[in-house]
């Protein structure tokens, strides 16, 4: 298992993972733009990208996770937790925030459900 910053050659893998999740608005072009405007880290297993997280941060106060996803065939193996642990190690003094429906996963990692957040379509 290896975690690193995403590079241009990862765009196709990120696209395929997003498509697996049914995220039809994620095009190759959009992912290319996201690689410029936000930060993406990937997790590799046997030289295959099996998951990624995209986030925004000011590196001082807040880190906001916009996506965290692992391929369906690689779930329940600790890879999502490894991505979170990587963020915690890289940004030890910032607060991590996110919106998610996977409450049990994040609660196991000691995230608190603060019940706030709003979204415009």
Which residues does each predicted region cover?
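Conserved acetyl-CoA pyrophosphate-binding loop and the N-cap/start of the following alpha-helix
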Residues: 74-83
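A conserved beta-turn-beta hairpin within the catalytic core of GNAT-like acetyltransferases
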Residues: 57-65, 75
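Conserved beta-hairpin
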Residues: 39-53
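A short beta-loop-alpha structural element at the N-terminal edge
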Residues: 1-13
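Conserved active-site alpha-helix within GNAT-family acetyltransferase domains
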Residues: 81, 98-121
